Amino acid sequence: MAIRQLSETLINQIAAGEVIERPASAAKELIENALDAGATRIEIATAGGGKALLRVSDNGSGMEATDLELAVRRHCTSKISETLEDIRTLGFRGEALPSIGSVARLNIASRRRDSAGGHEIAVAGGKIVHIRPAAANPGTIVEVRDLFFATPARLKFLKSEKAEAGAITEIVKRMAIAFPAVRFVLSGSDRTTLEFPATGDDHLARMAQVLGKEFRDNAILLDAVREDISLTGFAGVPTFNRGNSAHQYAFVNGRPVQDKLILSAIRGAYAETIPSGRYPVAVLSITLDPALVDVNVHPAKSDVRFRDPGLVRGLIVGAIREALARDGSRAATTGASDMLRAFRPGFQPHAQRPQAPWSAETSPFRPYPPAAGFSERPQASFDRLSMPTARAELQPSPQPGAPEPAASAETTGRYPLGAARAQIHANYIVAQTEDGLVIVDQHAAHERLVFEAMRKALHSKRLASQVLLIPEIIDLPEEDCDRLMQHAAELSELGLAIERFGPGAIAVRETPAMLGEVDAHGLIRQLADEIAEWDTASGLSAKLEYVAATMACHGSVRSGRRLRPEEMNALLREMEVTPGSGQCNHGRPTYIELKLSDIERLFGRS
């Protein structure tokens, strides 16, 4: 068969298969054109999920009649001329409008601000129907009807109208985040009107519009520069996380991207603070010289290629970790909100257990005896971590049953987490702050403190160990024993000394001194499982912090152990100065805060 030149219409339809995958793809291209034209107001209207109608109106610079005719021709553009090295616009290929016109009925009406009148062009299935004068306001209105009517096979691959409308909404949200100075309005027969008023340079206000006030309340500012590459944006505290990565937004020179390198860097930055299967919420904006990034590697321009990907990844990971450390004692505000909803009239819990009748024996005001298996003696590991200065300043609270003195402004206002007032169910510390109260999960909080202390020691020197008077003997499968012994030298750096004790057994002779009393059996078994899962032949050097987190969990104050008042206060003081203390090593919150105004509202006093 002879080789022949394809028709212009067929060429455009082939290009449309790459550029215009669905109605949301067309919406993205048209919104980008409006932004490149300098629009400050963009309105999007849809019907039938964008298949029946997609209209994008803007107040941008507009076009003359000659520009309209060129705009629907392939590879005609005003945005680049001779090189791809300095792309500063969202669009640049000149493919979007001819691709849309080849598979749909396209109508464009436009008028320049300095023109007395406007013009319109109509295209159907790749053929120009007419070009004529038309009444138009300054700016451009692009109307797409019957998308894919010229290639009906493509319609079979589209999702439901609701799903397609949702994809368009997501595109508008991403554009709204990237351009807070632009007003966006999305309306149509298949949705309620969505409006994002312009917020100027107030990016956080736009985040609140798009992502909700909860994100604004749980966001940490990012602002970092490395070798002329700048990173700005907001990262959510670790306890403010989601079940998928859909709430991670990345922009490169203002262009929304879904780049694997950036998403991987976000995961890496939160690796030690978020539970498996949960995802952080983040909005990142990277600004760099256009010559240092290639945006022409994907038909939809959703992926980019950095000249120095390692530098970009390091910038993202470092900036997020530094921000989390700087503001690390914060926990998400959502926990308190959920708890408050439980007290409001009409709230129905998922499962309500019958309550036992009240009696003096079960009264919550009765002093708790020591929990089974625990003594009243403080745990050694806690004393080693407590700050001497904090312990010297704080006076012990009265014994149970004694009158409780009123908290002074000096006591509650001096410390963000307040002063300990009680311990409930031998697990939760209740502290009074200047404007409310804080409830702390003692095990989760102490686990984080131990981990941070171990991590700090790891970076400075070998961890001190304590010799066990009687070694702990743990029976394990032979393969687990072999794996552990392969990494015995590295575990000794963490203060854990082990050796073989015959076939199928490990002897633990030393444990990290800062952990105090350790559940050696549980620790060794979990380490064996983790090493088997990692299956690392190159050693544990890259995983030592994960091992430290496991040790911290097994060496922390346990749930069910009573703490003395000075121990509780020392724990609060240590949390205030420890990075990341707002969440445990598994990403769960270590405390929740209730403002006095919220409590008063529950009792109708607001």
Swiss-Prot record:
Which InterPro entries does this UniProt record tie to the protein?
DNA_mismatch_repair_CS, DNA_mismatch_repair_MutL, DNA_mismatch_S5_2-like, HATPase_C_sf, MutL/Mlh/PMS, MutL/Mlh/Pms-like, MutL_C, MutL_C_dimsub
Keywords assigned by UniProt, alphabetized: DNA damage, DNA repair
Q: Which GO terms describe its biological process?
A: mismatch repair
User: Example GO molecular function term?
Assistant: mismatched DNA binding
The reply on keyword Ubl conjugation is: no
Q: Does the keyword DNA damage apply?
A: yes
Chain segments carrying region Disordered:
348-378
Described by its record, this protein's role is as follows: This protein is involved in the repair of mismatches in DNA. It is required for dam-dependent methyl-directed DNA mismatch repair. May act as a 'molecular matchmaker', a protein that promotes the formation of a stable complex between two or more DNA-binding proteins in an ATP-dependent manner without itself being part of a final effector complex.
Assigned protein family: Belongs to the DNA mismatch repair MutL/HexB family.
This protein is called what?
A: DNA mismatch repair protein MutL
State the organism's lineage: Bacteria, Pseudomonadati, Pseudomonadota, Alphaproteobacteria, Hyphomicrobiales
This chain is encoded by the gene named: mutL
